[in-house]
Amino acid sequence: MDNDKIDQHSDEIEVESEEKERGKKIEIDEDRLPSRAMAIHEHIRQDGEKELERDAMALLWSAIAAGLSMGASLLAKGIFQVELEGVPGSFLLENLGYTFGFIIVIMARQQLFTENTVTAVLPVMQKPTMSNVGLLIRLWGVVLLGNILGTGIAAWAFEYMPIFNEETRDAFVKIGMDVMKNTPSEMFANAIISGWLIATMVWMFPAAGAAKIVVIILMTWLIALGDTTHIVVGSVEILYLVFNGTLHWSDFIWPFALPTLAGNICGGTFIFALMSHAQIRNDMSNKRKAEARQKAERAENIKKNYKNPA
């Protein structure tokens, strides 16, 4: 009886795909696929299916942990800003601190919303059914909620726990206020760039191997150097201003959160994921044609062997 319940629950959160309909796994072996790009696409799509099928509470706790971890970006950048004041090239080194949170989150396999703007989207693009779209909305909603909760806890701790000196706290305020200098349209435009760069980073992971951490550092450092906006890192920075009384709660929602969230989704999903999926559509068509041809040839061989037994 219990096993039946478990099976029913698993069926409810199963991604619909052509492979599952045929009882097969996603092919990720480059030698068996038409192109290297398709091998990367299929590898990421496989990861996306796993994320879409995860239990909601597991996703939530992982997302909260990711939000807390992203506090390391504000922490490192603030400390670097104070300690490196007056040092030549300090701007480059300060922004290197921005990468710390991403390194922790990605290497620890925690749930980051902007990663899922490409990873979890590919299975839906492959088979855009209402069930798959529902799973994507569920994943995005749970992970975004968890990330915001985690960043809120981190920001609260930075403000109210006796951890940092006044110089570091002032640096946190300056970092947050630099973000708030952007207009809503600038928030949106900058977020498109950061969403696109995060999606590019995710696309590079399958080929990165042991150099994955280098890819994380380079891509997220570039996000920081470009003063782009990111919904999760920015939430730590802006919520810190809310908790110390510099900003009202409404300022977090607008002009920051809504334009930034829309920009990240646009950059990661509507630009990068669509383009990446489009480039391998013909490869997928050719793969299906090759499979159909092989199936027909096998059937023909079986028929010949049946007519002409040895």
Swiss-Prot record:
Membrane topology: Multi-pass membrane protein
Keywords: Cell inner membrane, Cell membrane, Membrane, Transmembrane, Transmembrane helix
Entry annotated with the keyword Cell inner membrane: yes
Segments of skewed composition (Basic and acidic residues): 1-12, 291-303
Membrane topology, Periplasmic segments: 82-90, 157-186, 233-251
Localisation: Cell inner membrane
Main location: membrane
A Gene Ontology BP annotation from the UniProt entry: formate transport
Cytoplasmic side: 1-58, 114-133, 207-212, 275-310
Disulfide bonding pattern of the chain: none
Pfam families, sorted: Form_Nir_trans
Protein name: Inner membrane protein YfdC
